Amino acid sequence: MGGAARAVLLGFLQASSSFDVRDSTGKVCIIANLTVAFSVEYKSSGQKQFAHFFLPQNATSQSHSSCGEGNTSHPILALSFGAGHLISLNFSKTLDKYQVEELTFHYNLSDETLFPNATEGKVMVATQKSVIQARIGTEYRCINSKYVRMKHVNITFSNVTLEAYPTNDTFSANKTECREDMVSTTTVAPTTPKHATSQVPTTSPAPTAAPSSPAVGKYNVTGANGTCVLASMGLQLNITYVKKDEKMGLDLLNFIPHNTSASGMCESTSAFLNLAFEKTKITFHFVLNASSEKFFLQGVNVSTTLPSEAKAPTFEASNDSMSESRATVGNSYKCSAEENFQVTDKALVNVFNVQVQAFKVDGDKFGAMEECQLDENNMLIPIIVGAALAGLVLIVLIAYLIGRKRSHAGYQTI
């Protein structure tokens, strides 16, 4: 289990960048220090590829940022970098809170530096709602990694200190801590790779056929007091590596359930699920927060043997500062949508149709389900569409009845 404790903290690979937004009088409306890492899926020669890069320290905020104008618009922190890339945080506030109402990322696939040989050379847009919230008069603080998942894009915020609507031009003395910092039960010293870089080399990876979605397998870990982890999921590992010729390679591996062995360990507040397939092993570290009676996925450790073309024969990565797959003890966490766990900027663990329960499991039976936000959003869309259609039908019916009544009123009795 030593590997699970060696966390490779993504945010420590790149120093934080500082930005502020001022109105026409020079008063600050947004101030921020943060590290932002991007992982973007794109197509190259018909094959799926991944670009990994950081928000550079020379990103600029002057062109597109604004403090808003009265009640007509809200403050926005917009950071432009590279060949037409833009990440923007749109803020709003209530009486006692401010929040990032919407996160938007524009990325230009014609940028050969970040997206070599991209099939489509156009600007793409990814958005996500409400990713940050804090009390008015406090700074928002989040040292641990905060993952934001969008279509084809994963964004990781770390080492974040920001404040909107500050009283003065500096951060407030009081702070609002993010959930990721509050639930951390262990402090892990960051480890820095010997050759850390802020973006992948500009040469294109060799085309790699993307496998289909993995089959779903069911796994469990049993200790002295019974089952402590029960999991059902499809599992896929995505590794970006350097080849011997210094080009980039992509290794995509689907776990085959009947060839996958499960083991693990049960402790009072920790549970480990080890899944081994061929020469690859993934360890999931679940933690119990006794005060809130919640369990969550805190860590993922990956070790594998790379293809013979790789410069290094083996690969190992770990992140023990996550806060994923959260549910009440006795219940199970369920997510039908694909989820992507970013271990490092070179390693992604993708899970499909996952259902997992830890610490209080009745044999091989899952407890009541707590659905993920992605599934709730997917369920909400047809409800909204259905309600809109029902409203449209009602409007047409009312218009028809009014028209019919008026036509009757036009007749004269002879």
Swiss-Prot record:
PROSITE patterns: LAMP_1, LAMP_2, LAMP_3
Keyword annotations from UniProtKB, A to Z: Cell membrane, Disulfide bond, Endosome, Glycoprotein, Lysosome, Membrane, Signal, Transmembrane, Transmembrane helix
Spans annotated as Second lumenal domain: 225-379
Cytoplasmic side, ranges: 404-414
Cellular component terms (Gene Ontology): cytolytic granule membrane; endosome membrane; late endosome membrane; lysosomal membrane; membrane; plasma membrane
Residue stretches of biased makeup (Low complexity): 196-213
Gene Ontology terms for molecular function: ion channel inhibitor activity
Source superkingdom: Eukaryota
A Pfam cross-reference name: Lamp2-like_luminal
Residues carrying covalently attached carbohydrate according to the record: 33, 58, 71, 90, 108, 117, 154, 159, 168, 174, 220, 225, 238, 259, 289, 301, 319
Region of interest (Disordered), ranges: 186-213
Membrane topology: Single-pass type I membrane protein
Residues covered by region (First lumenal domain): 19-181
Swiss-Prot/TrEMBL GO biological process terms: establishment of protein localization to organelle; lysosomal lumen acidification
Role this protein plays: Lysosomal membrane glycoprotein which plays an important role in lysosome biogenesis, lysosomal pH regulation, autophagy and cholesterol homeostasis.
Name the UniProt record assigns to this protein: Lysosome-associated membrane glycoprotein 1
Species: Gallus gallus
Name of the encoding gene: LAMP1
